[in-house]
């Protein structure tokens, strides 16, 4: 399933993702992944890929070192790593690998790409991305949208993305969750982009 999280600033989209990743603790209740509470077991980390923001990167590493680090953590051999990275060559546009630059020295857009690739190369069963279209040029936005769809369809990955870009979310999501002030106010099926009219109406009313 490919789930889109939408809502105005402060609606709770990023907070929800951080709760799922056990980066913050809930005041009440708990989060389960595959039947296990994320704050009591770390097994969910083995099959979960995520990129929330630049703090997930290790700024003093080169891209090669960063991807090697991820591969070591997830026990991915070098041959497999190189095969998976090759799938992203077009997305990187020869601007990332082989540059001998540290992550801190890349543009926001290329840092975004590195973080997203790092989340995807583990072939996760669950993938969480916060504002994946931020900082990217239009062609890269289209590419990442197709990549997200592909990993969901071909690998059976459950994907949750948050975004202010309603059109992209409506284009690729099978289900859209609308949050408002920390609460779920709509759970919209989105076959063939059916939810976009209701979303446009909601946000149009909010803007008046």
Kindly label every feature range from the protein language model.
Residues 116:
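Hydrophobic anchor residue at the start of the ABC signature
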Residues 127-131:
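Catalytic Walker B motif of ABC-type/P-loop ATPase nucleotide-binding domains
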Residues 29-44, 186:
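Conserved ABC transporter NBD signature motif
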Residues 121-125:
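A short, proline-enriched helix->beta-strand linker immediately N-terminal to the Walker B motif
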Residues 162-164:
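H-loop/switch region of ABC-family ATPase nucleotide-binding domains
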Residues 6-8:
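The feature captures the beta-strand-to-loop junction immediately N-terminal to the Walker
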Residues 21:
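Helix-to-loop junction immediately C-terminal to a conserved catalytic motif
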């Amino acid at each position: 399933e490919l789930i889109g999280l939408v809502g105005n600033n402060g609606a709770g989209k990023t907070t929800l993702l951080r709760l799922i990743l056990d980066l913050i603790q809930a005041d009440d209740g708990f989060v389960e992944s595959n039947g296990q509470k994320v704050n009591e077991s770390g097994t969910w980390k083995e099959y979960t890929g995520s990129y929330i923001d630049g703090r997930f990167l290790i700024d003093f590493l080169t891209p090669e070192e960063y991807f090697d680090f991820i591969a070591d953590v997830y026990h991915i051999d070098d041959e497999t790593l190189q095969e998976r990275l090759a799938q992203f060559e077009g997305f990187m546009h020869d601007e990332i690998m082989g540059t001998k630059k540290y992550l801190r020295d890349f543009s926001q857009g290329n840092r975004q790409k590195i973080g997203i690739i790092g989340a995807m190369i583990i072939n996760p069963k669950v993938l969480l991305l916060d504002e994946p279209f931020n900082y990217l040029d239009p062609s890269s936005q289209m590419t990442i949208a197709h990549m997200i769809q592909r990993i969901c369809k071909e690998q059976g990955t459950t994907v949750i993305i948050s975004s202010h870009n309603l059109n992209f979310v409506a284009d690729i999501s099978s289900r859209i969750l609308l949050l408002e002030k920390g609460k779920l106010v709509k759970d919209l099926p989105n076959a063939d982009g059916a939810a976009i009219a209701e979303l446009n109406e909601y946000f149009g009313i909010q803007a008046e």
